[in-house]
Amino acid sequence: MKVKTLLEGKPFMTEYGIVGYSTVVLIACDDEKNILYDCGSKGCALQLKEALEKAGMKPEDITHVVISHLHFDHVGNLPLFSNAEILLNKIEWESANQTPDEWHSIQTLAY
């Protein structure tokens, strides 16, 4: 198994506080599974494709994409990986699909 950082996350300060862009990690397994952990924001699609190419891969070679959470900087490039199985925590998916009247605090979701 090989683990390689394809895109390095970048935090930065705005007038609203600290924000940032996610790190994208490639996990190339010995059994021909190629897994991405998060896939970055749409604005870095070209850089992600170039990083995959440097690693000897194309988007079609990715078999799985693990999404840590559904923020724009973690899911923006999902359309590049239409052949991949998408893996996401059930609680994250259910939370994202709630109407505003059903939203819970982060503390409630943690327990």
PLM regions and their residue ranges:
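Zn-dependent metallo-beta-lactamase
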Residues: 1-32
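Short, well-ordered secondary-structure micro-motifs
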Residues: 16, 78, 97-99
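Metallo-beta-lactamase
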Residues: 88-111
